[in-house]
């Protein structure tokens, strides 16, 4: 059975003709807007650090970004069951930038295992045919080759999502979703690391860490797009990843989330990491798309809800 209900696809096509907020891919990276986040960083009080690593190696960028926010050992403990939640939603190659770069996924898996994780599980609820998504994204091959090389077949596993493992879950204090079918592996994990690819989204404007958690939702996800900002707050509150590592190796600047045309892709060579998903999204939206919180309704909603930082003034962005 296809993981995404057809009504969601229809909805996205309709939204592409009507949504007023899009990221202008032709403008390239609006780096000039980013210093406003740096200047806004509070000198006192609780500050969320967001690290941006640049370089030719996606794996090295992931490691340096995570090290800059305290390192994997401040998060993963010996014996933990860790879920890595990349984007594997689309039947696209790494060059097309619709899915998370496999080198970033493997770097995170290696870090977690080195920190003593008992098991690392990698999965996503794909929109295209799941087996094609897993294979053509390069993630399946990368996981299998790493596990074989390091004799980690029992500790690093790539899973296809199974309908039977979605369970109806209450969401206390919900803004919009009092209940939803959520994936059991995510509910039972000791730690979750959210590993989206940064890209344009026809309806939401951009899709980063907050929206990537739709991959743990069952049912007809198209329904939530009518109250998307509040629903994303609810899902991230119920299953709160404590680390976001945003892959910006190659960015789909327009015609997302599925893309397919290399002309829509920009090579950027960066990885963003934070222990605060909202802060990570604020910085990534600004850095790569020139969008502030008021331009992205679900980021604005997450700030207002206190899901993480409540203002860009609480963010300290560092280049590494």
Labelled PLM ranges:
Residues 2-320:
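N-terminal and secondary-structure boundary signal
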